[in-house]
Amino acid sequence: MKKIGFIIINYNDYKTTKKLVDNIKDYKVINEIVVVDNKSTDKSVLELKKINNITLIANEENYGFAKAINIGCKYLIDKYKDCYIFVSNSDIRIEEENDLKELVKTFKVKDIALVGPVIKEPDGVVRGWKLTSVNEDILMNIPLINRIYRNKLLNYKDSYYKTLLSYVDMVKGCFFLIDSKALEKINYLDENTFLYYEENILAKKLKVKKYKTVINNKVTIYHDHAKTISKNVNNINRYKITKESFMYYEKNYNDANSLQIFILKILNNINLIVKKIRKK
C-alpha cells in the first residue's frame, strides 16, 4: 500500500490550520501531515511548532500557492518515493476518515492521476469544471454578457454527476488528492503563478500526459471559501493577482495569440474599472 501524505498550506492563519490538524490527526489513513508555512507575518510558525505529530516546513519567503505545494510534495516524495498526496487549504473540514479512504480507493481505476471530492461551500456546491478555449475565455470576460456564457461553458450539467465517478477537466484547488508519480511526470505545478489558476495549469499538464481527473461523488468536503485569502488580500488586489495568473495561463498553456492577448488585456482593464466604481 502506498504511503499517504496530507499537505496543508498556511499563511497568517494558524488557528484555522490547527483546527484542520485537530480534525485529521487521528486518521490512520494518513501517514504524515505536512504544514507548509508561506512566510507568515503573524506568529504562525511559533504556534504551529507547538503542534505534535506534524512536519512543519517554514518557507523563507512567501512563494505563493503553487510553489508551496511543490515544496510539500517534494518533501513527501523524497521520503516515501511513491505515494498519494492530499493537498488542502487550511479552511477545510472533513466529516470522517472514511471520506479520505474513499478518495484513495478511486485510484484503483486505471490512468487516474487526480481525484477531487464534492466541495460544499457557504454559497453552494462545487464539483469539476471544463477547460475553455481562449475565445470562450474572452466571452466570459465581456462585461454584462459574461454571466450568460459562464455557466454553460464552464460547468457540467447536474445529471453528469449521477454516477460514482465523473471524469472532469479540472477540480477545485482547495482540496484534492494526487498520485506522486503523475506529479513527477508533469514536473510538478508551475511556480510562475503566485495565486490562482493553479487548477487550470495543473489540468492542462495532466491532459497533455493523458492522465485522467475525476470527481468522486460519494465524498463531500466542506470549505469555508476564501476565508484566508479574504483576510489577507483586498478585493481589488485579489482581482489583479487573479488576472496576472490568468494572462500567464492564456499565454503559456491556452495557446493565445497576440490579438487574443490584446483583447483580454483590454477586458481586464475594463472589468477592473467596473470593480473600482462598484466599490465607491
Give residue spans per PLM region.
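A conserved acidic beta->alpha catalytic loop
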Residues: 37-46, 61
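Short beta-strand-to-loop acidic/aromatic patch adjacent to the donor-nucleotide binding site
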Residues: 81-93
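Active-site-adjacent helix/loop segment of glycosyltransferases
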Residues: 204, 208-280
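Conserved donor NDP-sugar-binding/catalytic core segment of glycosyltransferases
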Residues: 93-130
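Short, flexible, basic/aromatic active-site loop/helix in glycosyltransferases
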Residues: 134-168
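Glycine-rich, basic loop-to-helix element that forms the pyrophosphate-binding segment
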Residues: 59-79
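A short, conserved alpha-helix in the catalytic core of glycosyltransferases
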Residues: 161, 169-220
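Short, well-formed alpha-helical segments that are part of the catalytic scaffolds
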Residues: 13-26
